[in-house]
């Protein structure tokens, strides 16, 4: 039974034949193969199947590691399969099991501890066993194949380097702090010379560019600032420079201020470049998550988790509170309410929600982010797939979330790029510079209005009314209360008439403008939660505001009832006093009659 030896190298498959059939059963195998002369006598070169390229080498070796018989290896084994009862020594046990399953191949593979010393000696003297193989070339091929195999095992892809995102977002946060510190220092430093400039130019980058371009404020008339500022702002800067209250500075002081202003400009330009890089990298690595929460929030989530794969392993509930670990454990320790959101709070969809809806929106968004980041980490797309195809799940999920938010809020939501305030109302982005006119005093407000009514009663009558008995005051109060009730009833009747005058077409039009169904709009309109203003616009009250109005109305009604009860009790007291006086007067009259008699 002949003994063959199969060796996998970085250059190809090597097939050798042992001179002694019982070589593996030898007790002193290591001593028989401890030199070049001895190993060349014991092992003879039979054939070498060379790999055509590095890609082929990676494919073949990866198949061997996974225990697969590749077509190239199968053709090599077919040459020795013609011999009867062949024994084949193999280094990989998985490969030996796979060779044993090949049909029509009478080969008995051996892959146990007896082959360890044999393959150790072959690897040590491999260049001497294969003719034409140089040790230098063999080392280079082994190094290249080991790198390629490591990439293959780790599923490495140059487009999915999430470490770059972690470093980029950390650097972006540090840049913001440094830039803010330097910009404030420049304003304080240059403010001694030209303090009015900080009020005219709130933008840090424009402020620094003005310092570098203009220098001393005395150069404002000759300096060309049109490339930096609009015409109106340029005129305001030059006018303020002429009447500035700042102190004079030396050229050396100004030179150091300019150096710091240049650093602010360089940092601002680099920050913009880094922000664009982070946006592009996030769209390449996590397009679905970027579509849902934005590039900056998504990058912070990845940095907090450590990698895209680590973030993909987390459920939606963990992603929802990621970044609020201190508050979570403090709440669990003190047995208080746990936080509803962490880093995801800064997403635009959560920011547009108001009040209690923020928690609901954060929970829904976190569940969609969990699905999106798993797709980003594990899904495989063709190389020619466009960005929209890669982010299709995120686009669909965002559309659903926007619809849910519209139903929760009962109003149309802001567009994707609009910044939102803490109360859920979109905030208009402030311009870099703006000149506001001072409000003038309204002189007409001092005079009496032309339609003002003259007092109905002279002052003497008012004094008499104050001296009148309390019963008349109570009667006047009752009359005023009745008039108020009549006014309220009239208003309610008018509102009911206005509601009845609306047609189905009007309800459909108004419901579409409010972003809700017709039935829902009718219910809220009849309830009073939605009202139509004089200019035709809708006033939609949230549940909290509507409940607050009802509570205020109930309090007013209770306050009105209290004086009514007091007036009734006072009337009863007055009647009781009158009865007592009449009883006292009757016996007095009887006494007078008896005295006359």
Curated annotation (Swiss-Prot):
The keyword rRNA processing applies. Residues 452-597 are annotated as: Disordered. It comes from the Eukaryota. InterPro entries: Nop56/Nop58, NOP58/56_N, Nop_C, Nop_dom, Nop_dom_sf, NOSIC. Pfam families: Nop, NOP5NT. Gene3D superfamilies: 1.10.287.4070, Nop domain. GO terms for molecular function: snoRNA binding; snRNA binding. It is found in: Nucleus, Nucleolus. Residues 482-499, 588-597 have a biased composition (Basic residues). Residues 285-410 form the Nop domain. Residues 552-561 have a biased composition (Acidic residues). GO terms for cellular component: box C/D methylation guide snoRNP complex; nucleolus; small-subunit processome. Keywords: Nucleus, Ribonucleoprotein, Ribosome biogenesis, rRNA processing. One of its GO terms (biological process) is endonucleolytic cleavage to generate mature 5'-end of SSU-rRNA from (SSU-rRNA, 5.8S rRNA, LSU-rRNA). Residues 532-551 have a biased composition (Basic and acidic residues). Belongs to the NOP5/NOP56 family. Required for pre-18S rRNA processing. May bind microtubules. This is Nucleolar protein 58. It comes from Neurospora crassa (strain ATCC 24698 / 74-OR23-1A / CBS 708.71 / DSM 1257 / FGSC 987). The lineage of its organism: Eukaryota, Fungi, Dikarya, Ascomycota, Pezizomycotina. The gene is nop-58.
């Amino acid at each position: 039974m002949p003994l063959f030896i199969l060796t996998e190298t970085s250059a190809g498959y090597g097939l050798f034949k042992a001179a002694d059939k019982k070589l593996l059963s030898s007790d002193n195998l290591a001593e028989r193969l401890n030199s070049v002369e001895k190993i060349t006598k014991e092992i003879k070169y039979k054939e070498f199947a060379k790999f055509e390229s590095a890609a082929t080498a990676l494919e073949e070796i990866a198949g061997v590691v996974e225990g697969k018989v590749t077509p190239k290896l199968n053709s090599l084994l077919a040459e020795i399969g013609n011999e009867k009862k062949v024994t084949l020594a193999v280094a990989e046990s998985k490969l030996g099991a796979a060779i044993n399953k090949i049909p029509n191949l009478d080969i008995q593979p051996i892959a146990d501890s007896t082959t360890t010393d044999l393959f150790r000696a072959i690897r040590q003297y491999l260049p001497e066993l294969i003719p034409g193989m140089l040790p230098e070339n063999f080392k280079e091929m082994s190094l290249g194949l080991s790198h390629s195999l490591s990439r293959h095992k780790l599923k490495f892809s140059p487009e999915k380097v999430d470490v770059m995102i972690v470093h980029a977002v950390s650097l972006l946060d540090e840049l913001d702090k440094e830039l803010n510190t330097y910009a404030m220092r420049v304003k304080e430093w240059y403010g001694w010379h030209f303090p009015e400039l900080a009020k005219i130019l709130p933008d840090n980058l424009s402020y620094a560019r003005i310092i570098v371009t203009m220098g001393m404020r005395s150069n404002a008339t000759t300096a060309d600032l049109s490339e930096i500022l609009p015409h109106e702002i340029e005129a305001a800067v030059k006018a303020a420079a002429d009447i500035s209250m700042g102190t004079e500075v030396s050229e050396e002081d100004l030179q150091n201020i300019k150096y710091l202003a240049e650093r602010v400009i360089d940092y601002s330009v680099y920050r913009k470049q880094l922000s664009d890089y982070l946006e592009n990298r996030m769209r390449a690595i996590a397009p679905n998550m970027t579509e849902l929460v934005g590039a900056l929030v998504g990058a912070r989530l990845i940095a907090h988790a450590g990698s895209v794969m680590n973030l993909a392993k987390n459920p939606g509930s963990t992603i929802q509170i990621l970044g609020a670990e201190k508050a979570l454990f403090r709440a669990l320790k003190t047995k208080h309410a746990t936080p509803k959101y962490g880093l995801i709070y800064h997403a635009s969809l959560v920011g547009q929600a108001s009040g209690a809806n923020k928690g609901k929106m954060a929970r829904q968004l976190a569940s969609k982010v969990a699905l999106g980041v798993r797709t980003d980490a594990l899904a495989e797309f063709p190389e020619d797939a466009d960005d929209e195809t890669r982010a299709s799940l995120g686009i669909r999920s965002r559309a659903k979330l926007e619809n849910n938010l519209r139903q929760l809020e009962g109003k149309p939501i802001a567009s994707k790029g609009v910044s939102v305030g803490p109360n859920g109302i979109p905030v208009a982005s402030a311009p870099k510079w703006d000149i506001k006119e001072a409000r003038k005093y309204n002189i007409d407000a001092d005079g009496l209005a032309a339609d003002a009514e003259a007092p109905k009663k002279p002052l003497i009558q008012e004094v008499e009314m104050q001296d009148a008995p309390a019963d008349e005051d109570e009667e006047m109060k009752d009359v005023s209360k009745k008039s108020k009730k009549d006014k309220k009833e009239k208003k309610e009747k008018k509102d009911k008439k206005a509601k009845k005058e609306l047609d189905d077409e009007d309800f459909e039009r108004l419901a579409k403008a409010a972003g809700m169904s017709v039935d829902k709009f009718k219910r809220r309109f009849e309830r009073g939660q939605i009202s139509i203003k004089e200019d035709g616009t809708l006033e939609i009250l949230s549940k909290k505001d509507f409940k607050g109005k009802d509570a205020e109305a109930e309090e007013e009604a209770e306050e009105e009832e209290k004086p009514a009860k007091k007036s009734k009790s006072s009337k009863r007291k007055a009647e009781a006093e009158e009865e007592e006086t009449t009883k006292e007067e009757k016996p007095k009259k009887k006494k007078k009659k008896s005295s006359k008699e």
